């Protein structure tokens, strides 16, 4: 895959899912399309929240190409939701050996101008949208209101009213708020 870089800064984020899915030796059973959705969602949110425009989605799937097709279709749909051309979705599957556990890796590559780096301003208010949810401790089922959608974050970032944004991961809201405060100057 070749891509022209129309800006001066690359923003790269990645995430993995392992042992969560429909395969025989998975520890936590889950729909493969939903696994793909969540696997793409985390790095897409990280790139969008950094103020970058996502350009490329790279997926690495530890399963054969035929069984991976529903996941690849979901990656293309997620890419489109984030403003990525579905033709800029690329990746690899494991067709050389049989696998019995789900393994997903997703990398998002985005671009931004140096001056576009989001920065909190004095007097800004911290607002939480959604809640940190993670398997196996939580029921990570489709349709939960606490799971913020990529299109919602895109709209927030494009509104001009959000100065800084960060997806809350497994560290929790307090840890992420401290990260925002430490970069606010």
Predicted regions and their residues:
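Glycine-rich phosphate/pyrophosphate-binding loop regions near the starts of catalytic domains
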Residues: 1-72, 76-133
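Short, solvent-exposed amphipathic alpha-helical segments in soluble enzyme
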Residues: 122-123, 142-145, 177-184
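Active-site glycine-rich loop that binds ribose-phosphate moieties when present
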Residues: 90, 107-117, 141-157
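Short, Lys/Arg- and Gly-enriched loop/turn segments at beta-strand edges
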Residues: 134-141
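Glycine-/charge-enriched secondary-structure boundary and capping motifs
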Residues: 74-85, 99-100, 159-185
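Short, surface-exposed connector motifs at secondary-structure boundaries
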Residues: 52-56, 157-163
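Glycine- and other small-residue-rich loops at beta-strand/loop junctions that grip anionic moieties
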Residues: 60, 142-145, 166-169
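Short, hydrophobic/aliphatic alpha-helical segments
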Residues: 33-36, 151-161
């Amino acid at each position: 895959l070749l891509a022209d870089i129309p800006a001066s800064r690359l923003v790269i984020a990645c995430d993995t899912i392992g042992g969560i899915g429909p395969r025989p030796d998975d520890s936590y059973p889950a729909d493969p399309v939903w696994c793909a959705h969540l696997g793409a969602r985390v790095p897409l949110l990280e790139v969008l929240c950094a103020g970058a425009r996502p350009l490329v989605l790279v997926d690495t799937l530890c399963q054969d190409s035929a069984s991976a097709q529903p996941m690849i279709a979901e990656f293309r749909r997620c890419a489109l939701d984030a403003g990525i051309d579905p033709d800029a979705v690329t990746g690899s599957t494991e067709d050389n050996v049989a696998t019995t556990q789900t393994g997903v890796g997703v990398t998002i590559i985005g671009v931004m101008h140096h001056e576009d780096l989001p920065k909190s301003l004095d007097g800004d208010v911290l607002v939480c949208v959604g809640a940190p949810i993670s398997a196996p401790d939580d029921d990570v089922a489709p349709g939960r209101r606490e799971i913020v959608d990529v299109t919602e974050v895109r709209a927030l970032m494009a509104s001009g009213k959000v100065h800084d944004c960060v997806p809350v991961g497994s560290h929790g809201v307090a840890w992420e708020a401290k990260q925002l405060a430490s970069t606010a100057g």
